[in-house]
């Protein structure tokens, strides 16, 4: 193999490595910047009043250090006139080091029958950054109305 041919092959291989590395880095960056999604489940989804429900939210996908989700205020709207909200005291956010919370849960008792839309919200200050809703049914219980 001539020196010119060897140099051409070396340059071609190096160019392929650079392109592959750039594509891999872009793919990682795209996944890291992706907003996580929320999944809400209420257990049990139906029952008799008074009904105690456990609502759980899983935060799926996206970056583990997604800045908007870090140290967010959590709000549960139970659709019965009750709203629960809490915030945590967190360390300052550091990209690549801080981790978002991946699971939230809360219990609530529904005293009256009806169909309820339970809504979970993640907020930064007064801005809702993500939310999800589920519906549950509470049937009249023996003690309701007495």
Q: Which role does the model predict for each range below?
A:
Residues 2-12:
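Bacterial N-terminal signal peptides that target proteins for export
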Residues 2-3, 23-146:
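Extracellular/lumenal mature domains of secreted and surface-exposed proteins
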Residues 10-20:
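Bacterial N-terminal signal peptides
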